[in-house]
Every structure is written in structure tokens, then in C-alpha cells.
Swiss-Prot record:
Gene that produces this protein: atpC
Gene Ontology terms for molecular function: ATP binding; proton-transporting ATP synthase activity, rotational mechanism
The protein's name: ATP synthase epsilon chain
Description of how the protein assembles with itself and partners: F-type ATPases have 2 components, CF(1) - the catalytic core - and CF(0) - the membrane proton channel. CF(1) has five subunits: alpha(3), beta(3), gamma(1), delta(1), epsilon(1). CF(0) has three main subunits: a, b and c.
Pfam families to which the protein is assigned, alphabetical: ATP-synt_DE (PF00401), ATP-synt_DE_N (PF02823)
Source species of the chain: Burkholderia mallei (strain ATCC 23344)
Regions annotated as coiled coil: none
Length: 141
């Protein structure tokens, strides 16, 4: 089966680099599925899980807190604001971040504070959802 080169990078480090049969991620207008031969594309991505199906059929999960997706012939690049490997996700930290964001939202004094709190809440909720999805998948194996 055909594959495509996939790179997931954050400002801090390269999170994933390898060949894949399929990539799924949260695009700005909805969930995107990328197969080899996909039309070139540049779009923003929302916070959520990136699912990468490797050549061997294994799945790799990476949580991204938003960023940019670039699809070129033979290559997919995810430039993430923040990226965390699925195995490194921490439900307790994500839940604490959600609570802090909700508190900040309640006490927002300006539009800037409100927008920041909404963004932090969306990221924490997406991270918790990614953790739940990953737990379901791990439970099947």
C-alpha cells in the first residue's frame, strides 16, 4: 500500500516523523482524513488528536493544541503550537487545566481575558476528549 511522509513538530521538538498509510486530525472546518495522493492543502487545525496509521498498521496518537497543516505530494507536515505524544497525556493535569480555565472564564475582566480563558478551556476539553478516545482504543487491544 502507498504511504506518505508525516512530520509532527512543535516549537520545542519533533514529535513524530515517519511513513504512514493514513492521517486523521481536527481541521478548522471539521475532521480531516489524509491519504497518500491527497490534494495539496494548507489549513489551520483545532486542538485535538492527530491519529497516524503507520506502514505496519500501528496507530500513533499526538495531541495538538492547534497549529497549521500542510499537505504536499508525498508529505504531510503538522506544525503544532503545542504537541504531546498520546502516551504522555495526563488526565489529571488536563482536568486541572479545565478547572483553571473555567475559573478564569468566570472572573474575566476584559475581552482579552475572556478570549484567553475560552481558548484555554477549548484546549483542555480537547485534551480530555483525546485522552478518552485513546483509552477506548487501548481498551480494544
Amino acid at each position: 500500500m502507498a504511504t506518505i511522509k508525516v512530520d509532527v513538530v512543535s516549537a520545542e521538538e519533533q514529535i513524530f516523523s515517519g511513513q504512514a498509510k493514513f492521517v486523521a486530525l481536527p481541521g478548522e472546518a471539521g475532521e480531516l482524513g489524509i491519504l497518500p495522493g491527497h490534494t495539496p492543502l494548507i489549513t489551520r487545525i483545532r486542538p485535538g488528536a492527530v491519529r497516524i496509521e503507520s506502514e505496519s498498521g500501528d496507530e500513533e496518537f499526538v495531541f495538538v493544541a492547534g497549529g497549521i497543516l500542510e499537505v504536499q505530494p508525498g508529505a504531510v507536515t503538522v506544525l503544532a503550537d503545542t504537541a504531546i505524544r498520546g502516551k504522555d497525556l495526563d488526565a489529571a493535569k488536563a482536568e486541572e487545566a479545565r478547572k483553571r480555565a473555567e475559573e478564569t472564564l468566570q472572573n474575566a475582566k476584559s475581552d482579552i481575558d475572556l478570549a484567553k480563558a475560552q481558548s484555554e478551556l477549548a484546549t483542555a476539553m480537547a485534551q480530555l476528549e483525546a485522552i478518552q478516545r485513546l483509552a477506548k482504543i487501548r481498551g480494544k487491544h
